[in-house]
Regions:
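Hydrophobic faces of well-ordered beta-strands that scaffold small-molecule active sites
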Residues: 33-38, 57-60, 80-86, 127-131, ...
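Terminal interaction modules at protein C-ends
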Residues: 20-31, 200-205, 240-241, 247
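Bacterial N-terminal signal peptides
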Residues: 6-13
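Positively charged n-region of N-terminal signal peptides that target proteins for export
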Residues: 1-5
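C-terminal domain-boundary segment and adjacent tail
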Residues: 151-164, 222-261
Length: 261
C-alpha cells in the first residue's frame, strides 16, 4: 500500500508546521497541545514521574542507551506516543553529550543511512523522529536529505525541534513529502524553576491564541522540575486545549498509518 501513502503525502500542499496556525481540522471549541519529553533512554531523573502523568505525551527516546527499550515499552504501555530522539551534531558542545550512534556531518552517506536505520530499530513503537542537539546537522542539506528520505520510506513524521534558525528540514520535508512539525517552545532551555514556570505561563497564553501548539521538556537535570511544573499546569492546559500526541497534529496521519503493511 506504499502508493497510497505517497499519494496522500503529496496532497499536503502546506507545511505541517505548528507555526501555521490554521491548517488543522479542529473542533471549533477546542485547540490542541502536544507536549514532547526528550532524552529518555538512560534512566534519567524525572522519567517515572513524567511517564506516570495522566495525559497522553509524546516521549522521545534516545537509541543505544541502557534503558532505551525499557523506556519506550513503559511509555507505550502508559498510553504515550513514542518517537526516536536521534542524536545529531551540534555547532558546539561536548561530543559526550551526544551519546552513541550520533549523526555527524563528517560521516559518509552510507554511514548516516546505517546509523539512522539502526537507531529506528532500537526504539520500539516509534512513529516519528526528532533530534537531540543537532544545530549543525539539521542545517546540512546532505545529512537531512538522507534522514528525511528514510523517514519517508518508513512512514514516519519528523519533529523539527528548532535548535537552529538555519534548519533545512522544512524545505526538504516539503520537497520529499515527509510530514513534519515544528517546536514552538522549550520549557527548560534554562534550567531554573523560575524559567520553567515562566515558559509554562507563556504556553498557557499561546493556547489562547493558537489552534495547535507544541512544547518540549526534558528528563535529566530538569526532569523533576518539569514533572512538577506539568502536574501544576496540566489542569489549566486541559481547560484550554486537548492534550494530544504529536501525530494528531498531522492531517491524515492516522489514515496514512493504517495504510502501512
Amino acid at each position: 500500500m506504499r502508493t497510497l501513502v505517497i499519494c496522500l503525502l503529496m496532497t499536503f500542499s502546506i507545511p505541517m508546521s505548528v507555526s501555521a496556525r490554521n491548517i488543522l481540522p479542529l473542533p471549533a471549541h477546542q485547540n490542541e497541545l502536544a507536549i514532547v519529553i526528550d532524552d529518555l533512554g538512560n534512566d534519567m531523573k524525572g522519567t517515572e514521574e513524567i511517564l506516570s502523568l495522566p495525559v497522553t505525551l509524546t516521549i522521545a527516546v534516545m537509541p543505544f542507551l541502557p534503558t532505551t527499550k525499557d523506556d519506550a515499552e513503559k511509555a507505550h504501555k502508559n498510553g504515550h506516543e513514542v518517537i526516536v530522539h536521534l542524536p545529531m551534531e551540534p555547532m558546539s558542545g561536548k561530543a559526550s553529550w551526544l551519546g552513541p550512534g550520533a549523526i555527524t556531518t563528517s560521516l559518509s552517506d552510507e554511514e548516516i543511512k546505517k546509523r539512522v536505520e539502526e537507531a529506528l530499530e532500537e526504539v520500539p513503537y516509534a512513529v516519528g523522529v526528532n533530534h537531540h542537539m543537532g544545530s549543525k546537522a539539521t542545517a546540512d542539506e546532505r545529512v537531512m536529505r538522507i534522514v528525511l528520505g528514510i523517514c519517508k520510506e518508513r512512514g514516519l513524521f519528523y519533529l523539527d525541534s528548532k535548535t537552529t534558525g538555519k534548519s533545512v528540514i522544512p524545505k526538504l520535508a516539503m520537497e520529499l513529502g515527509v510530514p513534519y512539525l515544528e517546536n514552538e517552545l522549550f520549557f527548560d532551555d534554562v534550567y531554573t524553576i523560575q524559567h520553567i514556570g515562566k515558559q509554562a505561563r507563556l504556553l498557557s497564553k499561546a493556547l489562547d491564541r493558537d489552534d495547535a501548539t507544541i512544547a518540549i521538556g526534558h528528563v535529566g537535570v530538569t526532569g523533576m522540575k518539569v514533572a512538577t511544573m506539568l502536574k501544576e499546569f496540566l489542569p489549566l492546559y486541559e481547560k484550554k486545549a486537548s492534550i494530544v500526541p504529536l501525530s494528531d497534529l498531522i492531517p491524515e496521519y492516522h489514515l496514512i498509518d493504517e495504510s502501512m503493511p
